[in-house]
């Protein structure tokens, strides 16, 4: 009987599941956002959040524990250097799962999992600037009105300089 065992096996054996979650966690740390199925995203959230909590305290012991799970020294370095600096004051909830619809091939529920504090990497460059709407004849009138003022200002400054 499997009373009280809440792990989602994801239809995989233990070694395959651990390797898949380690690879997905490395990709999440590297890219800060990945697309996957909802079930894998929920399993990845349970896998990676304790590792991010350990990365907040940079000790050799914590680095070795995290490396035992991730198996990638580049991901461990990135986690302890960049991610831990951003989430230092956050008490938990480092990831966000957003459902994005169904996959075309097999209609599986898809989700995007991302690190919460790294949202500006994707949304920072998309600031919308409203353009002022003008009529066709508006520019010609403004150009005619500003043209005589500029030489008059220059002539006043030249007379002041000559005196």
UniProtKB/Swiss-Prot annotation:
Cellular component aspect of the GO annotation: cytosolic large ribosomal subunit
Subunit structure: Part of the 50S ribosomal subunit. Contacts protein L32.
GO terms (BP aspect): translation
Keywords: Ribonucleoprotein, Ribosomal protein
Any Pfam family matching the protein: Ribosomal_L17
Transmembrane segments: none
Chain segments carrying region Disordered: 127-163
Protein's name according to its UniProt entry: Large ribosomal subunit protein bL17
InterPro entries the UniProt entry points to: Ribosomal_bL17, Ribosomal_bL17_CS, Ribosomal_bL17_sf
Biased composition (Low complexity): 145-163
A GO MF label: structural constituent of ribosome
HAMAP family, per database record: Ribosomal_bL17 (MF_01368)
Xref: NCBIfam families: L17 (TIGR00059)
Family: Belongs to the bacterial ribosomal protein bL17 family.
Highest taxon of source: Bacteria
Protein's organism: Flavobacterium johnsoniae (strain ATCC 17061 / DSM 2064 / JCM 8514 / BCRC 14874 / CCUG 350202 / NBRC 14942 / NCIMB 11054 / UW101) (Cytophaga johnsonae)
Entry annotated with the keyword Ribosomal protein: yes
């Amino acid at each position: 009987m499997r009373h009280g065992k809440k792990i989602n096996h994801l239809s995989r054996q233990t070694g395959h599941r651990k390797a898949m979650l380690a690879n997905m966690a490395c990709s999440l740390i590297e890219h800060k956002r990945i697309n996957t199925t909802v079930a894998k995203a929920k399993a990845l959230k349970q896998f990676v959040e304790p590792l991010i909590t350990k990365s907040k305290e940079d000790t050799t012991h914590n680095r070795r524990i995290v490396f035992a799970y991730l198996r990638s020294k580049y991901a461990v370095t990135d986690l302890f250097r960049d991610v831990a600096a951003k989430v230092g004051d956050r008490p938990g909830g480092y990831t966000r799962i957003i459902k994005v619809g169904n996959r075309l091939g097999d209609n599986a529920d898809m989700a995007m999992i991302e690190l919460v504090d790294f949202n500006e990497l994707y949304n920072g460059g998309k600031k919308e600037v409203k353009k002022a709407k003008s009529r066709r004849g508006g520019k010609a009138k403004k150009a005619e009105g500003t043209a005589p003022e500029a030489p008059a200002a220059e002539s006043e400054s030249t007379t002041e300089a000559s005196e």
